[in-house]
Each structure stands twice: as C-alpha cells, then as structure tokens.
C-alpha cells in the first residue's frame, strides 16, 4: 500500500467522521442533562476554547512528527469525546468530553488537509488537489445530510441513543485512519518550535496573495458561521421548530452538490474566479434571504450553502498552493485560529446588535460586512502565485 490510496481512504474517513446523528439535537441533549441553557452553551464554549488553545501547538507538532500520527490521535479523541458524552449525566463529564472534542478539532485542523496535499505531492498530482478536495468535501457534507435526517428520527425516541449511535461510524473512521500511509513529500521542519511558528507567520505576512486571501476567508468564516448559528432565531419566526432541522439537512445536501461542481466550474472560468465570485454569491444570497423577511427567507437562504460548496474548495486550494511543505500544518492552524477568533468576535457583535435592535438588523449587518470583506480576497487574487 502507498500514498496513492490516501485520497480514497480520506474520502471515506471524512464521511464516517461526519456521519453523526446528534448534530441537530446536540444542544438539546446537553440541556436534557443539565436543564440549563447557559450551562449547555458553556459546553460549546469549552470545546471552542480547547480547540483554540491547542490548534497552533498541534499544527507545529504535525509538521515535525508526521501527518498520520496526528490524524490517528484526532480520530481517537473524537471517538472518546462521544463515548464520554454518551455516558454523561452531569456537567463535569460533559465538560471533559467537550475539552477532548476541542483537542480532536485542533488535531484535525490543518493536518488532514496537509496530509492530502502531501500525498498528492508524492504521486505528482498536486494539480488535482482542487478536484480531490472538493470530492472529499462533497462526501462529508452528504454524510452530515444523512446523519441529520436519521438523527432527527432517532432523537424523537431518545436523544441519548442518537449520541450512542455516533460511536459506530467514528469507530470505522478510526480504523480507516490506521491504514493511511505517511506521505514522504515533506521538507525537514525548522530546528525549533519557535522558529517553526515564526517561519509560518513570516510566510503569511510576506506572501501577499496568501495574506489577503487567508484574511478575507477568516473574516468571512467568522461572520458567516456566527450568523449561521444565530440564523435559527430569525428563521423560527416563519417556520415551525421541527422544520429547522429539515432546512439544515437540505443545506448540507446542497453544499455537497456545490462541492461536486466546484472543480468543473474552475476548469471553465479559473480557480480564482470560482473562489471570488462564489464568495460574493454566498454573501449576496444571505442578504437577499434576510431582506425577504418572510416564509421565503429559509428557502432563498438554501442558495448560500450551494455557493459555499463551490467557493470553499477553491479557496482552500489557493491557500494550499502558497504554503511550503515544512510549515504547511502550522500555517493552516494559524489561519484557522484567526477564523475562530473572528467567529467569537462576530458572535458577540451579532448578539449585542440583536439585543439593542432585532435579529433582522443584526443578521443584515453581519452579512453586509461579510460582503464588503470579500474585497480582501479579490485584492489577494490580483497577486500571482509564488
């Protein structure tokens, strides 16, 4: 077995990693245990903080000890997180599971994409990265779609059963991580952790194409993801609560379809235009959905995940092409933590604005700012790849 099989295993690894049944009801499960929404949201916050603290250290370690080891450890911790949650009947074990889940997110962030890129480098297929990454994205978005639908049915009978059933696909994902072959196409890392980190920062700053695209993508992620988390409050004015899960599932399905189209569109109009125009379409349709302010809002908003599925693989490919192998995971982790910080700031901004005005104005402001931020990506795309 060699690295040429890695993309195939990565597709199915991502499918089973995201084929979970608790996505639509996780906060409801936490609340069923804790009977307190503030404490329930604390579990989410703990997972986010854990990921943020560990993201850069794990990225540096990945560049030094190898991608496969980090991937296996990430699969183990993700499985352990859900095992602990399945057995939890109080706050402390839920918190412990969240901290371990955050570590799993940090281990996967940057590392798994770097593993794919290095594997394609081994087989001299780097130019196929966009096509293969888009296919992997399509797989895991379809897994989220299927998991959300099945999970909604299972949770109707037992929310804890939905958590327990997650253990099965995550065990399969762990098994798939063990058959991955460590790529050889990886330059020697810097001599120390500090130099590794500094080298990644310098690359981000000195490479103007990478700097602007990564900054625009991180700000877009923060604004759009925080708005997406809050969107249910706005949409619940127009549809019953049970329909929110259906619209969320359809969003994953359309995202999967968009990812399937991404490489085809890039072949026709170029990867830069696919990334830039896709971002604009994503944010524009979000604004239109808010302006509808009616039953049409959740329907129009379904165009957003379709556009996201198209532009996300293109942006990821552009960023990957600008990073040297020796600092790949480190650089991706820095970019990821920037996006997480933007998410935290945007979430506070949206919540505060909703309190003093309304969810309508808060979401309209967030999506409008995101549309303006797209200009950073277009500035970056003007510079040629190094």
What are the residue ranges of the model-derived segments?
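Cytoplasmic helix-loop-helix junction between adjacent transmembrane helices
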Residues: 99-141
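Transmembrane alpha-helix termini and helix-breaking/packing motifs in multi-pass membrane transporters
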Residues: 32-33, 85, 144-165, 233-239, ...
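Juxtamembrane intracellular "pre-TM" segments in multi-pass secondary transporters
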Residues: 1-4, 181-216
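C-terminal ends and interior cores of transmembrane alpha-helices
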Residues: 76-89, 280-293
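Helix-loop boundary and gating motifs at the non-cytosolic
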Residues: 1-53, 206-251
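Helix-loop junctions on the cytosolic side of multi-pass membrane transporters
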Residues: 166-192, 379-386
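Helix-to-loop junctions at the C-terminal end of transmembrane segments
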Residues: 53-66, 155, 257-271, 354-355
